[in-house]
């Protein structure tokens, strides 16, 4: 008994004084102060994980973390899931591994032929984030990649909050660097592509982030110090890479990575890196050029001041300083810089042109006159200087000399509409009306081709003042109005031109488009819609006759014939002969084959169309319809499974519309239960889409979910009033036995759309269901005044129980 009690006391005091130490769980969302160097040979100390996704793969080995990109135009990253950092020093050694091509693929284009990188991030193609890698369309970053930048880029994402908010620091295989803040998938360039001078296949990329300051270094060389306060929260760190349009496969190796987040060490590193004595003059020059190209002239001017304190300016530096001063409207400073450049090289045309522009902007006409007189021979051979001669003569009220100078400038550069505009204005002042009109027309054609609609507006106003009834003036005005969305004014101009028998194919084509648009406004007036349809066809046919070698006109003519259920073989064949690689033409061929139940021909055309237009949902819709008619609709479902990353490119780009498309296909096939979840997915993407709400309601009616359908229709009605929604609400009310509500709904619809015969027919059917033949007869008497058709006569027989009257002659 004593021993047992002693044992109990011993266990009690042991548990009380010798408590077991429990290791608390690690919070990987914690903001930590540490120095950490990655050991990629160890799972615990590497932190990054191996993974695979859509078009990319990460693999960890003894030499580092390798990110493989398996297709062109891909931007992917792999997030380090351990801890968050705000102020830190990141150092990464990145190796660019050679690009490869799969068998049978064409070799890479030279840099001069590289396509531009798209300009915006594609948020729809990114799967979920941490710790997995993320793949997107390589849009990096807001502007075209310079030809010398290379074929790909790799780097770090830091302060990574989620897949749409982070900073991105990338260096290309050509040795160019850039920094962006990405917020809500929108890239905000902080430093555009800047040449670092690095040329090896291995880059040591360093970043020092302290508050709103970011110091960037490549291979221990200072590149820039950037200030930005867009993202001030701590975030993860990611290894990222982009593959552009040259190599099909690219791989990038993060062979070494270290991170320092201890405040004292970070501050020390920042001060050391930004010591003026450690920064070479060439770095200030390259940074100033990049900042000026980005439109940040004030920052560029600050860098030029630092550069001037370190070295003597040459021609390149003076020209850049002058350009930066002009951008800030510091024309005195610009004049000084360009004069210095001319001292360096008296024959430098760029300096001469820039100096002339700076003098003109200052209204320094005496200096400008001296400059042009000194370089008279050169001025007479250069379009810009001739234009300045015109400005000088105009300032001195020498209008004849000004007109001659502007005309000479336009002869030297016939693609510059402003020179023609200046000449026209002077000729008009001199009373040379016809010459002025011709000069204005030259300017108008150039502005229209360049889509310079503000300048074109000025020209059109002048032309309409000089000769408003001239055919060319009406044509230019109509095209301007059409391009700027003023379709009613454009219709007025084109209607007058076409009635006068215009010989301009573009006028007839645009007139046809406007008539097609007007056809849609006659939804409840069938005769007017048919008349517009016929006139549009005639307009497209006339455009084809005037421009027989334009595939677009033949395509539109064929399309109008197809929509009218007429033979379109001849114009379609002609369009294909002129433009065999036009995906829309192959899509129309597929639609025609589908109508004719020629499934093999439709499949062949759609295969070609989908290859040419991979992101167009309309083409995918026709493919789905083909499979539906073949009885293979279920085979199309994998194309819409975005969660498994096997979705079609068109689905990824437009999820809501794509899900809606598949739901409609199931509905058309009578598979209402299969359609319902796809309608739900579509509405989750676009909850305010009226068409989706209505189609979902129609599907619910088929499933006898009448209360659900009623709620959907009421929501659609709150967004947009349409006769079809009123009709469906009445149908649901009638099926629920609420005939008074159905009657009131249809009566209100008849009041709102008195020309819509469909609503009145539904009201007559409702009265027949309610056995109220008197009200049905009253509505039929109104209907027969608006429509004379077989269905109206059939209603007469139902109402009056007699043989319907014979059709009128």
Swiss-Prot record:
Segments of this protein annotated with the region Disordered: 103-125
TPR repeat start and end residues: 315-348, 383-416, 418-450, 471-504, 513-550, 552-582, 583-616, 656-689, 723-756
Record key words, sorted: Repeat, TPR repeat
InterPro entries membership: TPR-like_helical_dom_sf (IPR011990), TPR_rpt (IPR019734)
Domain of life assignment: Bacteria
Matching Pfam families: TPR_16
PANTHER family given in the database record: CELL DIVISION CYCLE 16,23,27 (PTHR12558), CELL DIVISION CYCLE PROTEIN 27 HOMOLOG (PTHR12558:SF13)
Name of this protein: TPR repeat-containing protein TP_0920
Organism: Treponema pallidum (strain Nichols)
